[in-house]
């Protein structure tokens, strides 16, 4: 069972005032991305009925290439991830700040591709993964994720059902009772991931995560385009990805990430 959210919040956070009706209208009106996100989510949920966890061989056959090259990928990635200089997720994307403020533990993140928008300088740090991503454009997002010891990711839902989320653990500690430091709760079920074992799931289900160990936990995160969508949703999905790419360009995400990446070791 995951730690109760109240265990990781401060009294100030628990006393946070409720928003007024006017504030809620402003926050959820049609001029805000949340409004359109919920409409899109409804469209996908009406058309795509699937379990929370799916077979990697069916949803992401190319994951076999990752497993075949696992040792090289792990070695190259951990050289970067365990350097102590990985950018914090909330420093890259302000929208992720609430995930940091939940427990004030920085979630390390090195994006390699974001909804089809490539970060070549970051990919250059992990040559084996760079080669894989070049061969597989249907991997629309890829990132190196580092959870520090004790990190809790509060329950939330992903915004986009047009992709599968794939985890490949690279640095995970085995704990008592067959548990590990890579603990996920998805749709009420707890999973403990092991190093070198891929895991494919739908992150639009309510989920949370925690690292209960005294060591960092390093995982590769991929978003894989779903090929089981009806044709009209395929079009909507590509529009969504195109908008996400434009947004990253307008936010100067490459420049911001490269500034952070200057702290990283180079090959």
Describe each PLM feature range.
Residues 2-155, 231, 235-267:
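Fe(II)/2-oxoglutarate oxygenase catalytic core
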Residues 146-148, 159-176:
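Short, conserved beta-strand element in jelly-roll/cupin
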Residues 191-206:
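Conserved metal-binding segment of the jelly-roll/cupin
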Residues 160-162, 183-189, 234-242:
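Short intrinsically disordered coil segments
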């Amino acid at each position: 069972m995951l730690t109760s959210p109240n265990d990781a919040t401060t009294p100030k956070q628990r006393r946070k005032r409720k928003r007024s009706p006017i504030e809620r209208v402003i926050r959820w009106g049609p001029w805000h991305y949340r409004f359109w996100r919920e409409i899109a989510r409804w469209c996908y949920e009406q058309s795509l009925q699937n379990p929370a966890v799916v077979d990697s061989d069916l949803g992401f056959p190319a994951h076999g290439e990752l497993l075949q090259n696992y040792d090289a990928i792990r070695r190259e990635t951990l050289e970067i991830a365990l350097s102590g200089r990985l950018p914090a997720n909330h420093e890259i994307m302000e929208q992720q700040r609430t995930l940091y403020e939940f427990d004030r533990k920085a979630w390390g993140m090195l994006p390699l591709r974001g909804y089809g928008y490539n970060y070549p300088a970051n990919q250059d740090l992990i040559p084996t993964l760079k080669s894989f991503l070049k061969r597989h454009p249907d991997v629309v997002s890829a990132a190196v994720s580092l959870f520090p010891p004790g990190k809790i990711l509060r329950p939330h839902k992903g915004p986009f059902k047009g992709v599968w989320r794939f985890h490949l653990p690279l640095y995970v500690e085995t704990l008592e009772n067959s548990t590990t430091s890579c603990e996920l709760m998805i749709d009420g079920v707890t999973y403990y991931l092991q190093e070198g074992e891929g895991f494919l799931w739908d992150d639009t289900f309510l989920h949370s995560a925690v690292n209960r160990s005294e060591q960092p936990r390093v995982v590769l995160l991929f978003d894989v385009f779903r090929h089981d969508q009806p044709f009209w949703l395929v079009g909507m999905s590509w529009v969504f990805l195109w908008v996400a790419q434009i947004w990253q360009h307008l936010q100067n995400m490459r420049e911001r990430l490269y500034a952070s990446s200057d702290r990283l070791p180079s090959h």
